[in-house]
């Protein structure tokens, strides 16, 4: 046992596969302050839309790439767990597709709506579409519709199928 050198035993430089490569150290994340324009939200809206859309498409591409790998792995492994992981990934891809379409709908809704800022002066114009307006006195309205109790009774009769 005298010929045993602990330093020689701990030296792993001659083991195959060990090249002494340096491990890449990533720089810490530096957060950047986002500029906001509360008086003119159009640039903010366009920037945010671009960021969200880009992120969703990148996510979709990564999911598709992973799906190809996972499908082959699931086929080769013949394992229910691998198929379950693949099915979960497919569900996530479907969700991302829906979110991309929802983003377009939301953007359309946002851009078609007229949003004013705090300092904006109201124009006095009102745009009402598909509104039913009753022209008459309150008594005539009560005769037409009835009070809240009568209206509730009428709804219950319709629901229960006991209309007269």
Swiss-Prot record:
Residues 36-114 are annotated as: Oligomerization. Gene3D superfamilies: ESAT-6-like. One of its GO terms (cellular component) is viral terminase complex. Keywords: DNA-binding, Viral genome packaging, Viral release from host cell. The keyword Chloroplast does not apply. Residues 1-35 are annotated as: Helix-turn-helix (HTH). GO terms for molecular function: DNA binding. Pfam families: DNA_Packaging. InterPro entries: Phage_T4_Gp16_DNA-pack. The keyword Cell inner membrane does not apply. Residues 1-35, 115-164 are annotated as: Interaction with gp17. The terminase small subunit binds to the packaging initiation site and regulates the ATPase activity of the terminase large subunit. The terminase lies at a unique vertex of the procapsid and is composed of two subunits, a small terminase subunit involved in viral DNA recognition (packaging 'pac' sequence), and a large terminase subunit possessing endonucleolytic and ATPase activities. Both terminase subunits heterooligomerize and are docked on the portal protein to form the packaging machine. Homooctamer. Interacts with the terminase large subunit gp17; the active complex is probably heterooligomeric. The N-terminus contains a helix-turn-helix (HTH) doamin that is involved in viral DNA binding. This is Terminase, small subunit. The lineage of its organism: Viruses, Duplodnaviria, Heunggongvirae, Uroviricota, Caudoviricetes.
